[in-house]
Swiss-Prot record:
GO molecular function: rRNA binding; structural constituent of ribosome
Pfam hit, one: Ribosomal_S3_C
Ranges of residues in domain KH type-2: 47-118
Cross-referenced PANTHER family: 30S/40S RIBOSOMAL PROTEIN S3, SMALL RIBOSOMAL SUBUNIT PROTEIN US3C
Family, per entry: Belongs to the universal ribosomal protein uS3 family.
Intrachain S-S bonds: none
Protein name: Small ribosomal subunit protein uS3c
Subunit organization: Part of the 30S ribosomal subunit.
Species of the source: Ceratophyllum demersum
InterPro entries per UniProt: KH_dom-like_a/b, KH_sf_prok-type, Ribosomal_S3_C_sf, Ribosomal_uS3_bac-typ, Ribosomal_uS3_C, Ribosomal_uS3_CS
Alphabetical UniProt keywords: Chloroplast, Plastid, Ribonucleoprotein, Ribosomal protein, RNA-binding, rRNA-binding
Domain of life of the native organism: Eukaryota
Compartments (UniProt record): Plastid, Chloroplast
Keyword S-adenosyl-L-methionine: no
């Protein structure tokens, strides 16, 4: 069996950059890692709670964290920022204070910035959320995957691969189903490929969604 390496880690320094950027002593490294996880979880929970659409569609592409001695900078790359801060002038301040309460930042100041993603349907996390929402509504998995591929056409991507694993359609035996459109050169380091793994809980159990998007080639 072929062993699949994570496409993002495989391309670090070439076409991908780190999602968290900070330095720490070896003994404090695990604390910094847990702090990052708490920040990300807190933001996702807040967005889910405050999101105005019933499907719970967050639209977060990724969350970047940069730490200095006196500052923690959190950059939220979001596909549909209007859904989060529409009609709410203090949306970001409220989110900032909410995150600050969740973890002890000490003497460091927390700064939250929201950045809009130009082509939201070219982001694997947003597509995975869309598919998860469809599966929860008991839409056929093939229909959900094909619709997600149609949405990527708006983002001018060169290729996409979608994979769903688990008890699909409530079948007793778990299986893996996938679909590919265009080129997805996983072994080419200069090929910029975005990837995400997403877990969705359905009435039949947990399903895993994986998406690879071939954006461009350097």
């Amino acid at each position: 069996m072929g062993q699949k390496i994570n496409p993002l880690g495989f391309r670090l320094g070439a076409t991908q950059s780190h999602r968290s950027f900070w330095f720490a002593q070896p003994k404090n490294y695990s604390d910094g890692l847990q702090e990052d996880e708490k920040i990300r979880d807190c933001i996702k929970n807040y967005v889910q709670k405050e999101m105005r659409i019933s499907s719970g569609f967050e639209g977060i592409a990724r969350i970047g964290i940069q730490k200095r001695i006196d500052l923690i900078q959190v950059i939220i790359y979001i596909g549909f920022p209007n859904l989060l801060i529409e009609g709410r002038t203090r949306g970001i301040e409220e989110l900032q204070s909410n995150v600050q309460k969740e973890f002890n930042s000490g003497n460091r100041r927390l700064n939250v910035v929201i950045t809009r993603v130009a082509k939201p349907y070219g982001q694997p996390n947003i597509l995975a959320e869309y598919i998860a929402g469809q599966l929860k509504k008991r839409v056929s998995f093939r229909k959900a995957m094909k619709k997600a591929i149609e949405l990527t056409e708006q983002a001018d991507t060169k290729g996409i691969q979608v994979q769903i694993a688990g008890r699909i359609d409530g079948k007793e035996i778990a299986r893996v189903e996938w679909i590919r459109e265009g080129r997805v050169p996983l072994q080419t380091i200069r090929a910029k490929i975005d990837h995400c793994s997403y877990m969705v809980r359905t009435i039949y159990g947990v399903l895993g969604i994986k998406i690879w998007i071939f954006v461009d080639e350097d």
